[in-house]
A protein has these predicted regions:
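Extracellular/lumenal and peripheral-membrane lipid-interaction modules
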Residues: 1-267
């Protein structure tokens, strides 16, 4: 579902392009036009292309109100393609690609009587999210290093090694060499991430072990953040374009890049 932040649902091609572009710009910081739409006979659409390349997304977007009351058929679209190369999500660069075929879209309104676009069904499609292990390692150094410096701790070295534990599970070993004044410590962090049968992504294990007083201090300091992370989860159904679509399968693969692939559709 995509909130359009307007009272009336678009009734022709130009209005729909404008509404979609304005709506997506509320969630993605990016200059220029995001949406391209091709249609020979509206409301039958040949292609909706969404270009998020180089955009910036808040890691905690505001929750979206569901549609309430009456809904109806808005249009049908042969293909919806989304490209998100070097898309920054919470400061972490990712590559995102999504393809949907034979999509049926409905109109509706939320509790504020603003129009919403509901992607009701798709015959088939897939979403692929990728990130290189090296880029993830650099992001951890940048983000965690900034927080560590608040405690007077410098990260001298950090190494990330990820591996798949199965089709829906992956593990990460993070080895850190830290320094505070003249004290040094080696800190090992283990993270396990699992995806449930309900397509909910959750950190199931998060452990820290450090040597010496500095290592113990770091692990103790991290415990509240670890506990908050263990309590959080992310449903793939909360992704606006997938909230109403039938999800079929998902798997993770790890090599030089970490790839998450979601298969969906009624086919």
């Amino acid at each position: 579902m995509i909130p359009l932040f307007r009272r009336l649902f678009p009734s022709h091609k130009a209005d729909l392009i404008e509404a979609l572009d304005e709506a997506l710009h509320r969630f993605v910081e990016k200059p220029g036009t995001i949406v391209d739409l091709r249609s020979r006979v509206f409301p039958y659409i040949d292609l909706i292309a969404i270009n998020l390349d180089g955009g910036i997304v808040d890691s905690s977007p505001p929750p979206m109100a569901p549609a309430e009351g009456e809904t109806g058929r808005a249009f049908e679209c042969a293909n919806i393609n989304v490209s998100g190369r070097r898309l920054s999500v919470g400061g972490v660069p990712l590559d995102l690609r999504m393809e949907m075929r034979d999509v049926v879209c409905d109109w509706g309104h939320d509790a504020n009587q603003d129009a919403v676009l509901i992607l009701r069904s798709a015959r088939e499609g897939q979403l692929v999210i990728s990130a290189s292990q090296l880029v993830l390692e650099e992001s951890i150094v940048r983000i965690v290093g900034a927080k560590a410096r608040l405690y007077g701790i410098e990260l001298e070295r950090l190494r990330l090694a990820m591996r798949a534990r199965g089709r829906r599970s992956l593990a990460a070993d993070i080895s850190v060499q830290a320094k505070k004044f003249f004290a040094r410590a080696k800190i090992d962090i283990y993270v396990q991430l699992d995806i449930t049968n309900e397509y909910v992504v959750k950190i199931s294990q998060l452990k820290c072990k450090g040597d010496g007083k500095l290592g113990s201090f770091v692990c103790t300091t991290l415990q509240p953040a670890f506990q908050r992370a263990l309590e959080k989860s992310f449903s793939l159904r909360s992704i606006p374009l997938l909230s109403e679509i039938q999800l079929r399968d998902i798997h993770v693969a790890v090599a030089d890049t970490v790839d998450l692939t979601v298969y969906f559709g009624s086919a």
